[in-house]
Amino acid sequence: MSMSHLYGKDEDSDGVEMENFEITDWDLQNEFNPNRRKHFQTKEEATYGMWAERDSDDERPSFGGKRSRDYSAPVNFISAGIRKPAAEEKSDSDSDSETQARRETFPKDFEAKKLRTGGNFKPSQRTFAGGIKSNTDFGSWERHTKGIGQKLLQKMGYVQGRGLGKNAQGIIAPIEAKQRKGKGAVGAYGSERTKQSIKDFPVVDSEEEEEKEFQKEMSQWRKDPGGGKKKPKYSYKTVEELKAKGKVGKSLSAPQKEISQVKVIDMTGREQKVYYSYSQLAHKHNIPGEAPGQGAKEEKPQGFALPELEHNLQLLIDMTEQEIIQNDRQLQYEQDMVVNLTHELEKLSEVLEREEKAIQNLSKVLETVEECERRIQPMCDNPLTLEECARIFEMLQDKYYEEYKMSEKADLSVAIVYPLMKDYFKDWNPLRDPTYGTDVMSKWKNLLEEGHLLSHSAHDASMDPYHRLLWETWVPLLRSIIAQWQPRNCAPMVDFLDCWVHLLPVWILDNILDQLIFPKLQKEVENWNPLTDTVPIHSWIHPWLPLMQSRLEPLFSPIRNKLANALQKWHPSDSSAKLILQPWKEVFTPGSWEAFMVKNILPKLGMCLSEFVINPHQQHMEVFHWVTDWEGMVSLSSIVGILEKHFFPKWLQVLCSWLSNNPNYEEITKWYLGWKSMFSDLVLAHPAIKDKFNEALDIMNRAVSSSVGAYMQPGARESIAYLTQTERRKDFQYEAMQERRDAESIAQRGIGAAAAVPMNFKDLIQSKAEEHNIVFMPLIGKRHEGKQLYNFNRIVIYIDRGVVFVQGEKTWVPTSLQSLIDMAK
């Protein structure tokens, strides 16, 4: 038995080194070792093969390759064994060849990656490249120190026992190794992950990612991964992508607006091309042989190219995509249509419900109206009363308000209410019972009136059932009553209209006053005779002033004419004239009243004063009192004028003649003071009257001072001087007091104006009226075009957007505030 296997079967008995060409375990283990030493075959080895000489320079320390024989080392024995017979070796070689064939069919990455060791020696005897030996005591000095790394980590805030990172999120324990149970491949015994790995990396790759990684590793062992026949790449488009494209893109089937006669020159290709519309340019296809654009990579020449077929296929694809898009749009349109129709159906259902409810309500209203019509028939057993009819209308207004407002209330009231209303007022006498029916009419006003309160014409009122009710049932009855009424008995008629003024529309009240009342008054004024009638005219004219106001102005002129004719033969001794004229002072305008006084009264008063005899010894004062009684009726200037003209010349003449005959100055003083007391303070304050009395004092002083050497009553001079001084002091005190009063009134007026500034134009007019003592008050129930009418001292006005309008003969005339005040005075 040969013992060669104890020394290695690669050596013969002569000690010659032999190299076997069989695949050993080392070859399999280092097949995929990238760090093994690669031996490139030289030219000499290729020529001589195994007989080629080796160069000693090639033998250099390395990690791989066959180590050179070291004869200085002791003999290494291998474990003993039994050499197999030739048959078994052959079978083993066959199995080895099969194993090698199987290994060639798998990629290199699936081989075990083990570094080749230098031979059968201990790990402690192995050396690295460069002759460096591996020693287990290498770096043993680190056992007694922390090292520079530990110091640097502690300087940066590292705490031992915690992980690295800002939030200590690093791992604490080092990476653990898990020993595999057997010698099987990776994953043969299940998952090999440690608890730390599962904790730090809980996410596991999916099977698809593992499959991709597997395919990628499989492709690494191919000879030419980039060469060979490539599989065609398919581009898939989902329906959702096509829908999204259809929302922003244009439809292919939609008609394109082409601009006619547009010449488009395409110079993007190898040669110039001309198109006659932009659509042709958009639908051009690639032509074989065209040069690629600049910067494009040259593609491999195609052996089989059909551009027409490609164009047709692309067109079919586009048409299919467009059909999908159109179907999606049609589906969306139909869905929107369904939603719209649903909303329309809901709206129509609501309308239908409302209409059905309206039909039911109208049916009930119709039944109620028919019942009312049946009960107003003459032969009805249960006749309808006006109160029951009012309750029925209230019920219709409360329960069926919409139908009640939409119905023709005028026709309904004409058919039902008018007969009942005529029957209700058939026996009524408004002059005896003016308040009869006011409560009933007030209720029907709320039921029938539609808000035409400011209407001024019968045409507008015909559209209002309440106005029509009054016009056709109430006004005819009133006409018959007024036709029999005597204007001199005005109190019952005035009371009647005062009770009904708040129930009457403006145009009906105007019609009553203008067409019924005023003609009766005008006719009665024409028949009036102030000389024979015992009833004063103001007693039956003035009660109409609050209702008619400016409507009575046409009557004032004939009244003044009749009064002037009656005063032609009048004498101031007759005091009845004053009683007749005094009520008209506030009715006539100031100008017309003053003109009437100057023409008819002042001449009579002046004639009386001219005939008045002044006798200091026996004075009769009746004539003088006749004149002074008219002081409040005649203006102050007119009174002063007739006194200056007819009284003071005679009075001063009597004084002078008395002083020239050695008078008793005490009696003269009393006579002077007695005549002065006969005048009112208002007359005495007039400058002309003051001058006349001062002139009398001057005459008396001259008379006293000129009597030098003649007999003079003792104390006369001092008495006259004292009288003069006293009278002058009284005049001065009166003037000072008057100035003080004027200053106080001006100051109070200024304070009041500053304290209470008018908020609007109406307040300003009111303040001006108070300053000038003018009556400013609203007229009850009087409006013009919706504006409240006011009485400004017998002048009718209304205010519209800060402008005052005054009633003229035919129209309303705008005027200023100062002009209005002048007209009122």
From Swiss-Prot:
Residues 41-61, 85-114 have a biased composition (Basic and acidic residues). It comes from the Eukaryota. GO terms for biological process: spliceosomal complex disassembly. Keywords: mRNA processing, mRNA splicing, Nucleus, Spliceosome. Residues 122-135 have a biased composition (Polar residues). GO terms for molecular function: nucleic acid binding. Its main location: nucleus. Residues 1-135 are annotated as: Disordered. It is found in: Nucleus. Residues 11-25 have a biased composition (Acidic residues). Residues 145-191 form the G-patch domain. One of its GO terms (cellular component) is spliceosomal complex. Belongs to the TFP11/STIP family. Involved in pre-mRNA splicing, specifically in spliceosome disassembly during late-stage splicing events. Identified in the spliceosome C complex. This is Tuftelin-interacting protein 11. It comes from Xenopus tropicalis.
